[in-house]
Amino acid sequence: MTNIRKTHPLFKIINDSLIDLPAPSSISSWWNFGSLLGICLIIQILTGLFLAMHYTSDTTTAFQSVTHICRDVNYGWILRYLHANGASMFFICLFLHVGRGLYYGSYTYKETWNMGIVLLFAVMATAFMGYVLPWGQMSFWGATVITNLLSAIPYIGTDLVEWIWGGFSVDKATLTRFFAFHFLLPFIISALVMVHLLFLHETGSNNPTGIPSDMDMIPFHPYYTIKDMLGALAMILILLTLVLFSPDLLGDPDNYIPANPLNTPPHIKPEWYFLFAYAILRSIPNKLGGVLALVLSILILALMPLLHTSKQRSMMFRPLSQCMFWLLVADLLTLTWIGGQPVEHPYIIIGQLASILYFLLILVLMPLVSIAENHFLKW
């Protein structure tokens, strides 16, 4: 009798995706982050579901309901901090996952890559709306500042902002709809993940060499299931350490002050994972220019397949491209630091230089260096 997992219509899909899936024998730990992101998504949906059972999306009670969760609900505090810090882990894994794709040339799988960019935008939108829900000072003013950016769109901007707000300022209607969308989006993300994996399994995984590995494949189970379990264990350990020892390390103390439309915090800034984009936004004195740069800082990823000028897929054997890549990483860390600093000298000029370098590296320097490497190898 044939094994049920290979014949049953539903089990067959799971089997072909997680058990008998042929995987390259050489993929390193950088390939763990896909499964870690899946685990993050599950953690976020589960903790979020239980938080939603006690949360009220009304401006008068939202802040109080979060306090109630932390003080009165059994293990409410751990749910709340798992959810908040789980978002940080989600973004750490996301950035490493995207970085891996850039380094090893995984973007040549165009459908998978573009689906990944859509997922990145969806996760960023979800995280932004989630940050508004506790209705603290930074929640309120973050929502006001970021939604206000849409007013830079010519002609329809102001109407668009008021339409999103559901009034003339961030108020009850805004909070209610943000809660609705924050609840809905993770399920849409789950569906998009399925599509992302569908596209990936059409081509199979890339590997560190960037060379086709069709002749050297091994089954996903047990080799990569056990490897992914190790990664998951490490990530959960880091997450629990964060939650149990310093849950507010990555948060903003201003968010423990209830939202007050009459009092602006001295420094409005988003969560740490948006700071690099926020720094790019602030480094351009023009409002529309800043918004365009903000969107392009992420959307530029879609151009990666077009900007690939090397004859080799991966950066594994390209030392000069590796230098450019790590310069880009250093630049993004600099932007993240600048995004959290006040708008004053010398941070302004550092932010502007880092923003210019970011686009210069991706659009000009990396493609040019790749062409030079082809030339050195007489290709």
Curated annotation (Swiss-Prot):
One of its GO terms (biological process) is mitochondrial electron transport, ubiquinol to cytochrome c. It is a multi-pass membrane protein. Binds 2 heme b groups non-covalently. The chain crosses the membrane at residues 33-53, 77-98, 113-133, 178-198, 226-246, 288-308, 320-340, 347-367. Its cofactor is heme b. Heme 1 (or BL or b562) is low-potential and absorbs at about 562 nm, and heme 2 (or BH or b566) is high-potential and absorbs at about 566 nm. This is Cytochrome b. GO terms for cellular component: mitochondrial inner membrane; respiratory chain complex III. One of its GO terms (molecular function) is ubiquinol-cytochrome-c reductase activity. Component of the ubiquinol-cytochrome c reductase complex (complex III or cytochrome b-c1 complex) that is part of the mitochondrial respiratory chain. The b-c1 complex mediates electron transfer from ubiquinol to cytochrome c. Contributes to the generation of a proton gradient across the mitochondrial membrane that is then used for ATP synthesis. InterPro entries: Cyt_b/b6_C, Cyt_b/b6_C_sf, Cyt_b/b6_N, Cytb/b6-like_sf, Cytochrome_b, Cytochrome_b_C_euk/bac, Cytochrome_b_N_euk/bac, Di-haem_cyt_TM. Heme b b566 binds at residues 97, 196. Pfam families: Cytochrom_B_C, Cytochrome_B. It is found in: Mitochondrion inner membrane. Disulfide bonds: none annotated. Belongs to the cytochrome b family. The cytochrome bc1 complex contains 11 subunits: 3 respiratory subunits (MT-CYB, CYC1 and UQCRFS1), 2 core proteins (UQCRC1 and UQCRC2) and 6 low-molecular weight proteins (UQCRH/QCR6, UQCRB/QCR7, UQCRQ/QCR8, UQCR10/QCR9, UQCR11/QCR10 and a cleavage product of UQCRFS1). This cytochrome bc1 complex then forms a dimer. A ubiquinone binds at residue 201. Heme b b562 binds at residues 83, 182. Its main location: mitochondrion.
